[in-house]
Amino acid sequence: FGRPFYIYKFRSMRLDAEKMGPALYRGGKDKRLTKVGKFLREHHLDELPQLWNVFCGQMAFIGPRPERKYFIDQIMEHDARYVFLYQIRPGVTSYATLYNGYTDTMDKMLRRLRYDLFYLQHRSWWFDFKILVKTFINICFGKKF
């Protein structure tokens, strides 16, 4: 774990979305989204190809969401505990995603880290089951992450 890998997703943003460098997703009003991409993101369908990552053993269904190195380096400048997340496979869904949503600021990234560390300390089959059920409910009833 902790090694870089290619994460599969449906393209939801324009090809030049990061021409000015890496940027965080700003929600449904993000101008970089395509029309189809907005629909995919709103219904979390852009994540479906990550099931291939799960099948290949690079990801788990539940675990801390993977992050790009550019943002990991920024998080590590504020909180070195990020390295603890390398103990387990990253996940398609996570405890942090359910309660923190998408991260578009450093404060939210650090809050997500705290949720992920809580998950790491308390993970169990029962905890994973609750995360799975809540994720399913949120997707079915359209709650925005």
Predicted regions and their residues:
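Conserved small/aromatic sequence motifs within transmembrane helices
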Residues: F1-F145
